Design a protein with these regions (language model features):
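Structural motif
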Residues: 141, 232-238
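Hydrophobic, Leu/Ile/Phe/Ala-enriched alpha-helical segments that form helix-helix packing faces
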Residues: 10-22, 59-71, 157, 161, ...
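Conserved ATP-driven motor cores of ASCE-family P-loop NTPases powering translocation/secretion/packaging/pilus
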Residues: 58-61, 277-353
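Short amphipathic alpha-helical segments
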Residues: 6, 51-59, 63, 149, ...
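P-loop NTPase catalytic phosphate-binding loop
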Residues: 40-45, 96-220, 241-297, 301, ...
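Short helix/loop segment immediately N-terminal to the Walker
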Residues: 219-234
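Conserved P-loop NTPase motor module
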Residues: 1-43, 289-297, 327-354
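Interdomain "pre-motor" coupling segment immediately N-terminal to P-loop NTPase/helicase cores
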Residues: 47-107
Length: 354
C-alpha cells in the first residue's frame, strides 16, 4: 500500500470512529501524514476539540486495530507531541504515533544448542524482530503465573547465556534449572534435605557476597584501565519469592541488601542478575533492585493485577496480546529499543535427541 493510500485509509477510519464535536477531515479539521517510523495526526487549530491524552488514546485505539497486522502501533504512556517544520501557526504541531512493521512473531528453533553456539557477539534473539544486547543489560526479570512458560523460557535463556556468560544457578525448587545445570556443568545452589531453609539462603547470600567482591575487583581494574574487558557473569535465581519467605529477619535483610548492591553496581563490571518469580512485589525483591532491571518480562495471564509490579503505569487498552503458552509482554530499556512495552511470544525450541 502506497503512503497516499495509507493516509486516506487512516483518515477514513478516523472520520468514521473519532467523533470529535462533529469535526472531520471533510471540514479540514485535521490531517494525517505517514512516514517510515509511524504517522502524524495534524490538528488544524483553533479547533472545537481538546488535544490531550484522551484524544491521543482514542486515536491509538482506532488506528491500532485498523493497521493490524501490517503495522503495530507502539503504546505510549501519554500524548506524543512533535513540532512540525512550517511557519503556519495553525499546523505547527502534531500527535505522533510510532509503529513497528508487522506483528510479534515467535522464533521456531529446531536445535537450540546448535542455534545458540552459532550466535554472534552478545545478541540474544527473543522474537523474529527483537533481540537483546547483553552488553547493555543490567538484569532480567521474568514474572508469570504457574504454568505460564517461565521455566521453558528460562531454559532457553540459560542455553544462550552459557555461550556468552559465566553462570551460577540458584534453584529453590530443585527442578528444571537444576537439571539443566547438571547436564551443562554449571554450578547450582539448591536445597538439601539435611540443611535448613536459613542455611540454604545463607549459601545464596555467600554467593552474592562473592559477586560483590568480584564487582569491587573489576571496578578497581576499570579505575586503572577504562578499556578493560571482562567476561559476563550472571547469577540466575528461580522462584526468588521462595527465598525471602520463612527465613530469619537478619538473613532476609542480608539477602535484600546484597541483591540491591549487585543490581546497582553490576552493570559496568558485566555482572548481571536473572530473576524469576510469580510476581515481583516488595516481598520478592526490594523496589530499588526491581527498578535497576532493564529487561522486564511478564508471561501468562495479562491484566492490570498481574502487570502492576513490572509495568505499574501501563494502560492495556488497545495492546494486542498474543494468546497461548509463553506469551505476554516485554520491555527492554536501553539505547537500542523504544522504552514502550510490546507483545511477546517466547521462542519455541527443540533439543537434539529429544
Amino acid at each position: 500500500m502506497m503512503r497516499s493510500e495509507l493516509e486516506n485509509y487512516l483518515l477514513q477510519a478516523l472520520n468514521m470512529a473519532l467523533q470529535i464535536s462533529g469535526e472531520s477531515s471533510y471540514t479540514n479539521s485535521f490531517g494525517v501524514k505517514v512516514v517510515d517510523e509511524g504517522f502524524f495526526f495534524i490538528p488544524r487549530l483553533p479547533a472545537s476539540y481538546i488535544i490531550d491524552d484522551a484524544l491521543y488514546q482514542k486515536i491509538y485505539l482506532i488506528c491500532n486495530a485498523a493497521l493490524y497486522p501490517t503495522y503495530s502501533l507502539i503504546k505510549q504512556t501519554g500524548a506524543y507531541f512533535v513540532p512540525l517544520d512550517t511557519d503556519d501557526i495553525h499546523v505547527k504541531r502534531a500527535l505522533f504515533f510510532p509503529w513497528s512493521k508487522g506483528i510479534a512473531k515467535r522464533l521456531i528453533i529446531q536445535d537450540v544448542e546448535n542455534f545458540a553456539s552459532k550466535l554472534d557477539g552478545t545478541e540474544i534473539p527473543i522474537m523474529e524482530n527483537l533481540t537483546i544486547n547483553y552488553d547493555k543489560t543490567t538484569g532480567i526479570l521474568i514474572a508469570g503465573n504457574s504454568g505460564a512458560g517461565k521455566s521453558y523460557f528460562l531454559t532457553y535463556l540459560l542455553t544462550v547465556l552459557s555461550h556468552i556468560s559465566d553462570l551460577v544457578i540458584v534453584d529453590p525448587k530443585f527442578d528444571v534449572p537444576s537439571r539443566w545445570g547438571r547436564d551443562n556443568d554449571v554450578e547450582v545452589i539448591a536445597p538439601n534435605e539435611s540443611r535448613s531453609k536459613s542455611d540454604f539462603v545463607s549459601a545464596v547470600n555467600n554467593e552474592l557476597s562473592k559477586c560483590l567482591e568480584l564487582i569491587h575487583k573489576r571496578q578497581q581494574i576499570l579505575y586503572n584501565d577504562c578499556n578493560a574487558h571482562f567476561n559476563h557473569y550472571t547469577v540466575v535465581i528461580d522462584e526468588v519469592l521462595a527465598l525471602s519467605e520463612g527465613v530469619t529477619k537478619s538473613i532476609k535483610e542480608a539477602f535484600y541488601s546484597l541483591l540491591v548492591q549487585v543490581s546497582l553496581l553490576g552493570r559496568s563490571t558485566k555482572l548481571h542478575l536473572l530473576l524469576v518469580s510469580q510476581r515481583f512485589d516488595s516481598n520478592a525483591i526490594p523496589i530499588s533492585c526491581r527498578e535497576q532491571m532493564n529487561v522486564l518480562v511478564q508471561v501468562g495471564n495479562i491484566n492490570t493485577k498481574t502487570t502492576q509490579f513490572l509495568f505499574p503505569d501501563l494502560d492495556l487498552k488497545g495492546i494486542v496480546i498474543p494468546q497461548g503458552k509463553g506469551t505476554g509482554l516485554i520491555q527492554i530499556i536501553d539505547s537500542e529499543h523504544p522504552f514502550q512495552v510490546v507483545p511477546l511470544l517466547t521462542p519455541t525450541y527443540y533439543i537434539k535427541g529429544e
